A protein has these predicted regions:
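Extended hydrophobic/Leu-rich segments
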Residues: 6, 10, 29-32, 145, ...
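N-terminal targeting/regulatory segments, especially signal peptides of secretory
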Residues: 313-315
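Beta-strand/loop motifs with alternating small/hydrophobic and polar/acidic residues, enriched
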Residues: 2-3, 7, 42-184
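Intrinsically disordered, low-complexity regions enriched in Pro/Ser/Thr/Gly and acidic residues
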Residues: 116-310, 319-322
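N-terminal single-pass transmembrane signal-anchor helix
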Residues: 17-46, 67
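N-terminal leader/signal peptides at the extreme start of proteins
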Residues: 1-21
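Short, charged/polar micro-motifs that form catalytic or ligand-binding hotspots
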Residues: 25, 29, 33, 53-60, ...
Length: 322
C-alpha cells in the first residue's frame, strides 16, 4: 500500500512538457501590440497635431473670407443707397464658429463671435473739421463739424479663434476696416473708406464713417451663425475751408497698433500729395482691467474740402446653428 501511494506522489510531481508553439504565439502577439502602439503614438503625437493645425489654419482663412463678405455687403449697401433712403434688402453673411476636428482622435476647435453696438466708450471713431460756414445761432465763430453733431461712429464685430495647434487669432470689423490680431502682432487686412487727393492747390479728403447698431451679443461654441446687416440710413455732407483747416481723426480701439500703422502708411504714400510736415499720427494707451485700449489721433493739415459720409448699419446674429 505504501508503494502505491509513493508512486502516486511521483506521478503528481511529474513536470509537464514545455509548449514552444504557445510561447512563440504569445511573444508574436506582444510584439504586434508594441508595433501597433508605436505607430499609434506616432500618429497621435505627430500626424494629428499637423492635421489639426491645418484644419485651424483653413478655418481662420475661411473666417477672413467671411469677414470680407461682411465688409463687401455693407459697402455695397452704402454705395447703392441714396441719401436718407432706408435699404430694403438685408445682407446675410454666414460665420462658422468651429474648426473641424479629427474623428476619435481630436475634437473640433471652438470659436467665439462677439458684437458690440455703438456706445460712448469702446470702440469709437470721430472726426473734427473747422468750416467756412457760420456757427449756429447763439454761437460765435465758424461751424466746426465734430463728434457732437454727426462726426462720430462706433460698434464692432469680432471673432476669436481659440486655436490649440495654430496660433490664436482675433479678427475684427470696425469702422469699415478688417483687422487681424494675434500673439505676435496685428495688421490691417482691409482699411476704412478714406481717400486723400490733391487737385492743384486744393487738398481734398473723403471719409465714410460706419456705425454698427443692435443688441450686444456673444456666441461661442460650434456650428454656423448668421449675421444680417441692414442699412438704416446713409447721409452725405460737404464742408469747405478756403484757408485750409486741420482735419482731426480720433480713434479709440483695442487695435491701436494696426490703426497707427495703417494711417502712417496711408499718409506716407506719394498719391496723397502730402509732405511729412502736413500730417501727424500719435498714439496713447490706457488700461481698463486686463484690457489695453489705444487712442490714435491723426491730424491732416491744410484741408480745403472735406466730404463726409455717415452710415448706420443694424446688425443681428442668429442663434440657429447649421
Amino acid at each position: 500500500m505504501q508503494i502505491n501511494n509513493f508512486a502516486k506522489i511521483i506521478k503528481l510531481k511529474k513536470k509537464k512538457a514545455w509548449n514552444e508553439d504557445g510561447v512563440a504565439s504569445t511573444i508574436g502577439t506582444i510584439m504586434a501590440l508594441l508595433v501597433f502602439l508605436t505607430f499609434l503614438g506616432m500618429f497621435t503625437n505627430q500626424y494629428i497635431p499637423a492635421w489639426m493645425e491645418d484644419n485651424e489654419n483653413n478655418h481662420m482663412n475661411g473666417i477672413i473670407q467671411q469677414f470680407s463678405f461682411l465688409k463687401w455687403g455693407i459697402d455695397s449697401l452704402i454705395l447703392n443707397s441714396d441719401e436718407g433712403e432706408v435699404a430694403s434688402v438685408p445682407i446675410y453673411t454666414p460665420m462658422q464658429l468651429h474648426a473641424e476636428g479629427v474623428p476619435i482622435f481630436a475634437s473640433a476647435t471652438v470659436g467665439r463671435l462677439s458684437f458690440v453696438s455703438e456706445n460712448p466708450s469702446y470702440p469709437w471713431f470721430s472726426v473734427s473739421f473747422p468750416t467756412d460756414e457760420d456757427a449756429p445761432a447763439g454761437e460765435s465763430g465758424n461751424f466746426v463739424f465734430n463728434d457732437t453733431n454727426g462726426g462720430k461712429a462706433g460698434g464692432s464685430m469680432e471673432f476669436y479663434g481659440a486655436n490649440r495647434y495654430y496660433v490664436q487669432q482675433t479678427l475684427a470689423y470696425e469702422n469699415g476696416a478688417i483687422i487681424l490680431n494675434q500673439t505676435d502682432g496685428e495688421t490691417m487686412l482691409s482699411g476704412m473708406a478714406i481717400r486723400i487727393v490733391k487737385y492743384g492747390d486744393e487738398q481734398i479728403v473723403k471719409i465714410t464713417q460706419i456705425s454698427l447698431t443692435g443688441t450686444n451679443r456673444t456666441i461661442g461654441g460650434y456650428g454656423t451663425k448668421g449675421v444680417t446687416s441692414t442699412l438704416e440710413y446713409s447721409t452725405y455732407s460737404k464742408f469747405e475751408n478756403s484757408s485750409g483747416g486741420n482735419l482731426t481723426i480720433s480713434i479709440n480701439s483695442r487695435f491701436g497698433t494696426a490703426w497707427e500703422d495703417y494711417f502712417t502708411n496711408l499718409l506716407s504714400a506719394n498719391s496723397t500729395g502730402l509732405t511729412t510736415a502736413e500730417w501727424n499720427v500719435t498714439t496713447s494707451s490706457s488700461q481698463v482691467g486686463d484690457i489695453t485700449y489705444y487712442s490714435v489721433t491723426v491730424i491732416i493739415q491744410g484741408v480745403n474740402v472735406f466730404e463726409h459720409t455717415k452710415a448706420m448699419v443694424a446688425i443681428t446674429i442668429a442663434d440657429i446653428s447649421v
